[in-house]
């Protein structure tokens, strides 16, 4: 109804009487139109803060200054970064380096003169470099959050990838698919650690930099496995290898 005006206004009747004052006003206006109500603005101002709490930065900084470490070997930037997240990041760094080592062994195998599948060699070499970049990206994040990078042992990968039934190309690509799925599961486990620790920075980092890319890699290698199963051994493998050599990209 018209009687319920905004809080910054007061209502006057036709005789100039204030019917429902909401704030004090130094000026009033006389009505000119019959029995209709006239709305008049109020000049009063509410000086109370909206939240009732005044931000005093130097008072709050006193508490934070007590938390700044003075020991030289202690991180200064670390904040809300749990030991579980730090350890899980180091484990994932090891996973990425192991992946890079396996892919590098595959590159060396397919680059042999008696194998000579240059497209597969190129694909696995690029995949090895990409896994190494993933490890370095995790190391940079570890340092950014104030953690300490601890490199773990890397297992020696196999050097032979020939398979009497499947052939070397299909066998190696199936190994790559299993490796990418295993890596995806480890990333999901790392994301679960971040969620349990309420570490939104780590969770966002994994979602934006790793998880989407990992699903894309699994999809692409799955298609490669399906294509190699379809062409069988022989000339079809050479055609597939030429496709990777001219158009392929790393997982």
Swiss-Prot record:
Oligomer of 24 subunits. There are two types of subunits: L (light) chain and H (heavy) chain. The major chain can be light or heavy, depending on the species and tissue type. The functional molecule forms a roughly spherical shell with a diameter of 12 nm and contains a central cavity into which the insoluble mineral iron core is deposited. Residues 46-78 are annotated as: Extension peptide (EP). Residues 1-45 form a transit peptide. CDD domains: Euk_Ferritin. Stores iron in a soluble, non-toxic, readily available form. Important for iron homeostasis. Has ferroxidase activity. Iron is taken up in the ferrous form and deposited as ferric hydroxides after oxidation. Fe cation 1 binds at residues 96, 131, 134. It catalyses: 4 Fe(2+) + O2 + 4 H(+) = 4 Fe(3+) + 2 H2O. GO terms for biological process: intracellular iron ion homeostasis; iron ion transport. It is found in: Plastid, Chloroplast. One of its GO terms (cellular component) is cytoplasm. PANTHER family: FERRITIN. The keyword 4Fe-4S does not apply. Keywords: Chloroplast, Iron, Iron storage, Metal-binding, Oxidoreductase, Plastid, Transit peptide. GO terms for molecular function: ferric iron binding; ferrous iron binding; ferroxidase activity. Its EC number is 1.16.3.1. Fe cation 2 binds at residues 131, 180, 214. Belongs to the ferritin family. Residues 79-232 form the Ferritin-like diiron domain. It comes from the Eukaryota. The lineage of its organism: Eukaryota, Viridiplantae, Streptophyta, Embryophyta, Tracheophyta. This is Ferritin-1, chloroplastic.
């Amino acid at each position: 109804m018209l009687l319920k005006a905004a809080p910054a206004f007061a209502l006057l009747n036709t005789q100039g009487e204030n019917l429902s004052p909401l704030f004090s006003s130094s000026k009033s206006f006389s009505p000119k139109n019959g029995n209709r109500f006239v709305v008049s603005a109020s000049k009063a101002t509410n000086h109370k803060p909206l939240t009732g709490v005044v931000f005093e930065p130097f008072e709050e900084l006193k508490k934070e200054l007590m938390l700044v470490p003075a020991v030289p070997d202690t991180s200064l930037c670390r904040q809300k970064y749990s030991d579980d997240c730090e350890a899980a990041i180091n484990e994932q760094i090891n996973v990425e380096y192991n992946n890079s080592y396996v892919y590098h062994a595959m590159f060396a195998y397919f680059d042999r003169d008696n194998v000579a599948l240059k497209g597969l060699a190129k694909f696995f070499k690029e995949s090895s470099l990409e896994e190494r970049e993933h490890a370095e990206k995790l190391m940079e994040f570890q340092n950014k959050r104030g953690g300490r990078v601890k490199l773990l042992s890397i297992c020696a990968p196999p050097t032979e990838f020939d398979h009497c039934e499947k052939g070397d190309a299909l066998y190696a690509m199936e190994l790559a698919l299993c490796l990418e799925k295993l890596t995806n599961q480890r990333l999901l486990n790392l994301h679960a650690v971040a969620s349990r620790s309420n570490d939104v920075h780590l969770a966002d980092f994994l979602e934006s930099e790793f998880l989407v890319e990992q699903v894309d890699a699994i999809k692409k290698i799955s298609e490669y496995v399906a294509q190699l199963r379809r062409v069988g051994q022989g000339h079809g493998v050479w055609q597939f290898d030429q496709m990777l050599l001219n158009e392929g990209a790393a997982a």
